[in-house]
């Protein structure tokens, strides 16, 4: 017994020593909004800013090479400039750094101002007040932006498909809810009736900057607008995948004719249900809670508050709230990023940075931008530009035009357990890896909830934009957006265990997951995902292999009410669909030979595909080794879709198995189609796991169960 007691005593002492050593291996620096500038940074004597905490951390590294944690106490930390954690600003990355909130407290990094209640006043200019509708006139309040300390009130700009991304204009948030620039109609759009002049069309090379002219009908509402030349219109003016926004020039309210100051990217059209517009930036249209208008001349904000008005915030900072560059081994945890006109976090050339359990909301751009963007030469054009830090700009078009561009996203960076919502231009933009060597970036987005991420720009501003090589998106719930959930470029990406739903709600000819137009971008795997409730009134897809896309394996996914077409293959090859479940969708798949007809120009000699293939040396290692069929692309009749097989899939209540010619998408005999419940655990309530007695096990020998319970966002203990 004495021997046992002695051993236990020694063990306890060892444990105490280890715990003590562990505790001493971390230096803690505390921050509190009401702390002191010259404080020591202890829990009882905290500093008052993150910047000061970083200064203390930098001084401690040479003396005590231990891990450092900066702990933020509850409160709001206002940022008038970007907070920098960079090699140039002094962080050496010699020790791991963690920045986190204290226990369960809420630490907010804020890029704007919280407006004091006494600054919210009744409208004093009665002549101006007469512009408001009589029924709401007494409810509208005004804020002097000078009194609120807002120096830069911003300005509206063109935005939309193939236009550069840029910081938003001044925005107001009431009770955490984004305000809306006063618009009409409050919901929906007004059809374009007839097009008198489509205007110049920048997309097809016309740079004359001529506005368009079209007619509307059925309303006299514009006759109320005193200064229509200050108003803007937005909508899908030509194609249902291309939103746009342009300033008005004038309105003939008698003839119901609208003329715009500048051109729409694709010009104006009519005759399609999405070809419509709504007008905004109109003080006369403040008629619902949250609507606002900024008078640039008087620097006054007018808005209609809700009945339960609490906190009022105004965004101001146009640069990122936080920038990390040339640094390693940094962890951000339980932080709250909000109220910036630009992006939440910008990262460049980072390694091992982890962003965990953070919230990003009410931002004018995206939450996280992992890499270097492209500063546009012209804010209205998507052409050209210069790679630039801490910006987004023309990055989407630039990557399209320069498909091997390394935008310096770093490697081994991860975004986990975060929530992103109410952002203006998407969620997470992530690169990493080398498209010439196929070296993986190993960057990842895991277990995040990303929703309502297109407040301002509607198309091709996805929940996750993933480029480069060897990056992955897993266990994310991505939902409630007018267009794309995941937009891909590059090679060897893994998309798994995601719940993608209520996407493509407004757009036409778009997919919840989209990639295409580059046959060298291969090696992708899409598995164990749940695509459901995709699309609105127009043609949409769950997985969109656009314009000759090749080399994506799609297996063990569930597609339920997954748009018009669950898997849309636009002329490509080597896109097998295996062991998937398709339920209550018009077409399980689509196949066409567009590279033989309307899209054949991409195969021209010295054309787009030849340029993109030769850029990566497609017929030499490593491409010829990883993708052996690609090495013979030109000898293998590239205009004909091939090797797009459909095997071991379950189709339940599908109106037609495929849209297109069967020889291009062979349905093998091991698929099973039925119009009745095949033995789901609970068909009616959406539990599409197969019961042990399901007929599928016999109908499709070798069919493997899809682990529905592992799909989507997983709550952590």
Descriptions of predicted regions:
Residues 1-26:
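Bacterial Sec-dependent N-terminal signal peptides
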Residues 26, 30-348, 354, 361, ...:
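Extracellular polysaccharide-degrading/modifying enzymes targeting complex plant/algal/animal polysaccharides
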Residues 55, 250, 416, 474-475, ...:
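A broad, structural surface signal
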Residues 82, 92, 343-346, 364-413, ...:
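Glycine- and acidic/polar-rich repeat regions and solenoidal domains
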């Amino acid at each position: 017994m004495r021997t046992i007691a002695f051993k236990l005593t020694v063990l306890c002492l060892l444990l105490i020593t280890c715990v003590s050593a562990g505790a001493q291996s971390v230096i803690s620096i505390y921050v509190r909004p009401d702390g002191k500038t010259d404080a020591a940074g202890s829990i009882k004597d905290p500093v008052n800013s993150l910047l000061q905490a970083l200064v203390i951390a930098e001084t401690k590294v040479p003396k005590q090479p231990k891990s450092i944690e900066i702990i933020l106490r509850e409160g709001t930390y206002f940022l008038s400039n970007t907070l920098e954690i960079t090699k140039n600003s002094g962080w050496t990355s010699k020790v791991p750094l963690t920045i986190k909130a204290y226990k369960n407290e809420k630490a907010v990094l804020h890029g704007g101002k919280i407006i004091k209640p006494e600054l919210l006043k009744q409208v004093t200019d009665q002549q101006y007040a007469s512009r408001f509708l009589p029924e709401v006139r007494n409810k509208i309040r005004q804020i002097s932006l000078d009194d609120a300390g807002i120096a830069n009130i911003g300005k509206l700009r063109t935005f939309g498909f193939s236009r550069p991304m840029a910081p938003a204009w001044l925005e107001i948030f009431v009770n955490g809810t984004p305000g809306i620039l006063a618009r009409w109609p409050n919901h929906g759009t007004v059809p374009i009736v007839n097009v008198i002049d489509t205007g110049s069309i920048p997309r097809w090379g016309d740079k004359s900057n001529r506005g368009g002219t079209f007619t509307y009908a059925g309303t006299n509402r514009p006759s109320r607008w005193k200064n229509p030349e200050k108003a803007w219109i937005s909508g899908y003016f030509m194609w249902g995948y291309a939103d746009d926004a342009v300033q008005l020039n004038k309105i003939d309210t008698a003839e119901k004719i609208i003329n715009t100051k500048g051109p729409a990217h694709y010009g104006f059209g009519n005759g399609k249900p999405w070809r419509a517009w709504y007008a905004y930036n109109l003080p006369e249209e403040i008629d619902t809670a949250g609507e606002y208008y900024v008078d640039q001349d008087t620097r006054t904000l007018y808005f209609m508050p809700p009945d339960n008005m609490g906190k009022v915030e105004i965004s101001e900072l146009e640069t990122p709230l936080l920038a990390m560059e040339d640094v390693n081994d940094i962890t951000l945890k339980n932080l709250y990023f909000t109220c910036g006109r630009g992006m939440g976090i910008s990262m460049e050339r980072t390694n091992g940075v982890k962003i965990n359990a953070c919230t990003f909301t009410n931002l004018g751009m995206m939450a996280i931008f992992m890499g270097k963007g492209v500063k546009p030469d012209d804010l209205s054009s998507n052409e050209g530009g210069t790679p630039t830090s801490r910006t987004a700009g023309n990055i989407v078009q630039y990557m399209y035009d320069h498909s091997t561009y390394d935008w310096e996203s770093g490697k081994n960076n991860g975004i986990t357990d975060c929530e992103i919502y109410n952002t203006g231009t998407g969620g997470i933009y992530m690169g990493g890896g080398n498209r010439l060597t196929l070296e993986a970036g190993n960057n990842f987005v895991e277990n995040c909830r990303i929703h309502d991420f297109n407040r301002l720009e509607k198309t091709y501003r996805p929940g996750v934009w993933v480029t480069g090589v060897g990056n992955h998106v897993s266990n994310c719930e991505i939902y409630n957006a007018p267009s794309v959930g995941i937009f891909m470029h590059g090679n060897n990406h893994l998309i798994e265990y995601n719940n993608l739903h209520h996407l493509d709600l407004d757009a036409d000819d778009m997919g919840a997951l989209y990639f295409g137009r580059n046959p060298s971008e291969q090696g992708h795997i899409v598995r164990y995902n749940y695509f459901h409730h995709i699309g609105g009134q127009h043609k949409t897809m769950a997985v969109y292999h656009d314009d000759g896309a090749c080399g994506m394996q799609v297996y063990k996914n569930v597609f339920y009410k997954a748009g018009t077409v669950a898997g849309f293959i636009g002329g490509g090859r080597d896109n097998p669909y295996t062991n998937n479940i398709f339920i209550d969708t018009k077409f399980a798949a689509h196949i066409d030979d567009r590279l033989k007809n309307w899209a054949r120009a991409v195969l021209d000699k010295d054309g787009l595909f030849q340029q993109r293939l030769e850029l990566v040396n497609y017929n030499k290692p490593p491409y010829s080794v990883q993708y052996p069929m690609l090495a013979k692309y030109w000898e293998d009749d590239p205009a004909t879709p091939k090797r797009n097989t459909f095997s071991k899939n379950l189709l339940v209540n599908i109106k037609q198995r495929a849209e297109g010619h069967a020889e291009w998408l062979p349905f093998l005999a091991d698929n099973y189609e039925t119009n009745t419940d095949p033995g789901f655990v609970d068909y009616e309530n959406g539990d599409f796991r197969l019961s042990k007695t399901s007929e599928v096990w016999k109908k499709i020998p070798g069919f493997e169960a899809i682990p529905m319970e592992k799909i989507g966002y997983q709550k952590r203990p």
